Design a protein with these regions (language model features):
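Active-site neighborhoods of enzymes that stabilize oxyanions during catalysis
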Residues: 265-373, 377-388
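C-terminal motif of bacterial Sec signal peptides marking the signal peptidase cleavage site
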Residues: 13-15
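His/Asp/Glu-rich, glycine-adjacent segments
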Residues: 82-199
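Metal-dependent active-site segment of extracytoplasmic phospho-/sulfohydrolases and closely related
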Residues: 31, 49, 211-252
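Short, structured active-site-proximal loop/turn typified by the sulfatase FGly-forming signature C/S-X-P-X-R
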Residues: 40-87
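Bacterial Sec signal peptide processing site at the extreme N-terminus
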Residues: 17-26
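Loop/turn elements at helix/coil->beta-strand transitions in domains of secreted/extracellular proteins
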Residues: 25-29, 56-60, 129-134, 178-184, ...
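A long, amphipathic alpha-helix that forms part
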Residues: 22, 162-174, 191-232, 282, ...
Length: 409
């Protein structure tokens, strides 16, 4: 016998049931990098937009980078799901026996050689499966990796104001169906710049964080004006955190060897050098165990935890500074004195297990869980998450789909 009260209860339960998740083929992912956002800034600085997105979506207590916890290697890990040894971008600055020139963040000509870039960045994964992708600044996006790029991309210009970066993304999102990207990237450098100059505990770092938060708010408003709120999923990350520096924690290379006798590819906090005369053992002996906060290794003897032992793009001699210590030269310290400048206030690149190196992870949108807080996890798993959100099959990677499964609706 049909009971009106039971019918009313069933109707109420149906109305209260959470709406079904958005189909993956209609989902859009916007991957936002806030360079240098440390794991604890969300609580310390209370940015309104990011705090709201974190509450409405999935938040991690920290995002663990790869070593060295530098910008280019970790940005490329995020979009490939590969460790540094597997995708090849082992540092911001490196050399390879089979590629001419020195790779650096400022050397666009050398960066353009596709032989540096391994793996399958997600914009290529998406495009190969019939989707459109757009990259508003991301390491690797300016190079044809595997013979292809995103449909839309921009040459990196750190002087481009944040509002123009956001405007470009909104312009792409307002394209008609079929031309509109399903995967987009966006990058902000304000906070990393402030952290390096003034340190992670400075007022300037807080101001930079809130400035970026306002830009993210502009993006969210633009997505709403484009009528895409119910389709857009935000994946907001940082490549690393930031550790404070001090004049009292300097390692001056000149105290142990003449810098002119070596090709120093990388400085701090991971020293990478090759002796000009080819005598690796002599230079290794000059540095080994000379400073209690500098750990020196031959390339083949780098501890397994760092995942880079024997890699041909790693310098023959590597020195790794302890967290908070800075490797420098007498020439650099003299310049600080001459111009009455302070040394850098902060840096990164340290052992990825250091808490100060952990970054930000927020994921919010119709394909993602609401109000979920997860323990810190490695950034190699982000590629699988983003592929799952937009419904594409991931290429081979080092992530574990089980790590991100509970984040999905």
């Amino acid at each position: 016998m049909w009971c009106p009260a039971l019918a009313g209860l069933l109707l109420l339960l149906t109305a209260c049931r959470e709406a079904p998740p958005l189909p993956a083929d209609r989902a859009i992912v916007i991957l936002i990098s806030i360079d240098g956002w440390r794991w604890d800034y969300l609580e310390r600085f209370s940015p309104p937009t990011l705090s709201r997105l974190a509450a409405e979506g999935v938040r991690a207590e920290g995002l663990i980078p790869q070593f060295p916890s530098k910008t280019f290697p970790n940005h490329y890990t995020i979009v490939t799901g590969l460790t540094l040894a597997h995708h090849g971008i082992v540092s911001n600055n490196m050399q390879a026996p089979d590629i001419p020139g020195t790779f650096s963040m400022s050397n666009r000509d050398v960066q353009a050689d596709p032989r540096w870039w391994g793996g399958d960045p997600i914009w290529n994964t998406a495009e190969r499966q019939g989707k459109v992708a757009a990259a508003m600044f991301w390491p690797g996006s300016e190079t044809k990796v595997g013979g292809r790029q995103a449909t839309f991309w921009r040459d990196f210009d750190d002087d481009l104001p944040n509002h123009e970066r956001v405007s470009q993304l909104i312009e792409w999102l307002k394209l008609p169906e079929g031309k509109r990207p399903s995967f987009l990237t966006l990058y902000f450098s304000d906070l990393d710049n402030a952290g390096h100059r003034w340190g992670p505990d400075s007022d300037q770092a807080r101001e930079a964080a809130l400035r970026v938060d306002r830009s993210v708010g502009e993006l969210v408003a633009g997505v709403a004006s484009a009528g895409l709120t119910d389709r857009v999923n935000y994946v907001i990350v940082s490549d690393h955190g930031m550790a404070a520096l001090s004049r009292d924690r300097m390692i001056v290379v000149d105290d142990y060897l003449d810098p002119a006798t070596a090709d120093i590819v990388d400085w701090s906090p991971v020293l990478g050098l090759s002796p000009n005369d080819g005598d690796v053992e002599k230079m290794y002996a000059a540095l080994k165990d000379k400073h209690p906060h500098l750990h020196v290794y031959r390339r083949d003897e780098i501890p397994a935890v760092y995942g880079l032992a024997g890699h041909p793009r790693v310098s023959p001699i590597v020195g790794i500074a302890d967290e908070g210590w800075y490797i420098t030269s007498r020439a650099e310290t003299d310049r600080w004195l001459q111009h009455e400048r302070n040394p850098p206030g902060g840096t990164h690149g340290y052992d990825a297990r250091a808490k100060s190196m952990q970054g930000l992870f927020i994921a919010a949108g119709p394909r993602l869980r609401r109000g979920l807080v997860v323990k810190p996890f490695e950034n190699i798993h982000l590629y699988n998450l983003m592929c799952a959100v937009i419904g594409i099959a991931p290429s081979k990677n080092d992530g574990n789909p089980a790590v991100i499964q509970d984040m999905l609706r």
